[in-house]
Amino acid sequence: MRPATKIYGLIGRAVDYSYSPLIHNTAFEQLSLPCRYTIFNITEEHLVADALKGARALGLAGFSVTIPYKKTVVPLLDSLSEEAKSIQAVNTIVNHEGTLVGHNTDIAGFASPLLPHARSIQGRPVAILGSGGASLAAIEAFRTLFMPSEITLFMRNPAKETRMTDPAIKRCALGDLRESGSESSALLRDAAVVINATPVGTLGRPDAHMSPVPAESNLLHQGQIIYDMVYNPLDTPLLLAARKAGAVTIPGMEMLLAQGAAAFRLWTNLEMPMDAVRSALLNEIGASAI
């Protein structure tokens, strides 16, 4: 008798572009697991509670959660992991026989490709571009694993930003990077690591050809690590400019794979077959760029 198929899925809004089904279904197939991963587009925030209630009733095995619902699901779950509590955001849900537990694998996923550089980051300043949910995971990872001397957050309008109120984090305006003599420019130039946590440079967006760091600014240089969370295309305008300047570059695909592997482990207690998944993802991203 065949075991029933376990259903996993991605909760989000207008997320048909996601590579998560490819990642997880490739892993399930490689390990011959009776599991399937699909997409659940939820059009309105108030419907998320109904979706989770239905998941309990139907016995859906687990979920990934993406924008704009990473914080929406928090009060709707039965418990949270320590990582999810620390930033009050969930990107992975495990259904334990009707008990929904929220986790956050973005923190570990973000940290994974930076770990080989940990010693060179400790005690030095870092910069994060963007103030959305992705930046929260980066901040928590830096604080708990890398101990930089200072974290500077570059945002569109620091005066109106209400989410990032921690006095230990320096806040600057992204627009000031266009002024060569500004404090913002100096802070970015001095940063050991620069993280792009904005969607600028993503394939298909109006700003796909742009970098969040102005190309003419000469702020990127040898000795820096430039990490772009954007995973499609592999070589974003920011990474191309950073490589030209002699910096070490980390593409967003590394975070995508690492956080996906952590979620897979939570759901199955197994390690994701990374070589097969990476190959499938590279083929898909390469095809989408043609």
Swiss-Prot record:
The species this protein was found in: Chlorobium phaeovibrioides (strain DSM 265 / 1930)
Keyword Amino-acid biosynthesis: yes
Catalysed conversion reaction: shikimate + NADP(+) = 3-dehydroshikimate + NADPH + H(+)
GO molecular function: NADP binding; shikimate 3-dehydrogenase (NADP+) activity
Pathway recorded for this protein: Metabolic intermediate biosynthesis; chorismate biosynthesis; chorismate from D-erythrose 4-phosphate and phosphoenolpyruvate: step 4/7
Name used for this protein in its record: Shikimate dehydrogenase (NADP(+))
Similarity comment text for this entry: Belongs to the shikimate dehydrogenase family.
Catalytic residues of the enzyme: K70
Annotated NADP(+) binding sites: E82, G130, S131, G132, G133, A134, M229, G252
Keyword terms of this UniProt record: Amino-acid biosynthesis, Aromatic amino acid biosynthesis, NADP, Oxidoreductase
